[in-house]
Amino acid sequence: MNNQSLSLIETLSRDAATAAQTLAVLDEQTKNTVLLDMAKSLRASTAEILAANQQDLTRAEEDNLGSAMLDRLLLTPERIEAMAQGIETIVSLPDPVGITRDLSERPNGIKIRKMRIPLGVVCMIYEARPNVTADAGALCFKSGNAVVLRGGKEALQSSLVIAKVLQAVLQQHKLPKALITVIPDPDRGLMMELMQQRAYIDVIIPRGGEGLINFVTDNSKIPVIQHFKGVCHLYVDKDADLDNAMALLLNGKTQRTGVCNALEGLIVHQDVAEAFLSKAAVELASHKVKINACSRAAKYFTGCTVLDDSEFGQEYLDLEIAIRIVDDFDHAIDHIRAFGSHHTEVISTKNDATAMRFQRTVDASVVMVNASSRFSDGGELGLGAEIGIATSKLHAYGPMGLESLTAEKYLVNGTGQVRS
């Protein structure tokens, strides 16, 4: 790192802030036209993107990165198509910018409304997630924000090529390429400098492991929206349909392990523990899932690791799960309160009152009843491609789509009133 590099960070941040002023007043039709062209260009550039991704994968394998990281890093024609479709979904969503709502008319005749406006410049700091480059670029563009992207070294080549494709479309439409900016050097010192650019950047959204989130939160001078780890639980209630509960368990744990909405914990009411866990032992073994369990649950599994209380709450991101038998509903809630990460929690039950109590009581950004944790995703919830899942409650909570990338300002209209 040198002074020239530091100057580059400030220049890129300033250029993004300047570009954001242009985008803030762009009409929805123009935005949608640009986004559709971005989707087309991603498809047309599939071979180039895959070649860059292969460079990242080769380096990752040489560095012995884990299977979860490799899965997040991997791009395929199908995943690139999903990125393009995600952008097209964003096109179909209403533009939140400029939407107003009436609040009141005061006794003195002034009228008060609120209008949605862009945040300004959003900075994304993320690890081995090349899809974030396209998702964040498109979401920020539609919501009127410039975005500065600082990806990890693991996905650098993929991110640079994806950004180049999107920037080319911007320039074709006579828009500044600084609307989607990628920091070309993953040096950690440059990331520190980026987090000091509060004169130009309005919010930072980190996506990655626990270490990255804590580092950004501790060192940023810019407000941070945390997207923390996903320690998601399935609670099998005493009134659960056990076949449905099994489907939720297998889908949540085995469909795709290296994502934040995968199940990491299974909590089972003692009244159904024998019936459910006896079958779960067979099903999980067939999927080669490693079992970690409390002493009460361990007897149902061969070769499992017995956990004490301090060892729950891990984000495995692999074919591995922690299992606990609880005495009752309150015991389940206590476990989630102690070991959950405010991401996604699931209950399997046929009891409507219990389901409602679970949704009202559990402190998580998404609370599912009889539905897989894997639906905790912006696309699945109808938001289009998400910028992440916020686990801190300030400004946004849960999957962040277009509206979450805006704020509201007051509009006050009068006829010459003055305050006495």
Swiss-Prot record:
Enzyme Commission number, as recorded: 1.2.1.41
Subcellular localization(s) per the UniProt record: Cytoplasm
InterPro entries for the chain: Ald_DH/histidinol_DH, Ald_DH_C, Ald_DH_N, Aldehyde_DH_dom, G-glutamylP_reductase_CS, Glu-5-SA_DH, GPR_dom
Biological process annotations from GO: L-proline biosynthetic process
GO CC entries: cytoplasm
Domain of life (superkingdom): Bacteria
Pathway field: Amino-acid biosynthesis; L-proline biosynthesis; L-glutamate 5-semialdehyde from L-glutamate: step 2/2
Keywords: Amino-acid biosynthesis, Cytoplasm, NADP, Oxidoreductase, Proline biosynthesis
Any one GO molecular function term: NADP binding
Catalysis: reaction(s): L-glutamate 5-semialdehyde + phosphate + NADP(+) = L-glutamyl 5-phosphate + NADPH + H(+)
Function of the molecule: Catalyzes the NADPH-dependent reduction of L-glutamate 5-phosphate into L-glutamate 5-semialdehyde and phosphate. The product spontaneously undergoes cyclization to form 1-pyrroline-5-carboxylate.
Similarity comment: family membership: Belongs to the gamma-glutamyl phosphate reductase family.
Protein name: Gamma-glutamyl phosphate reductase
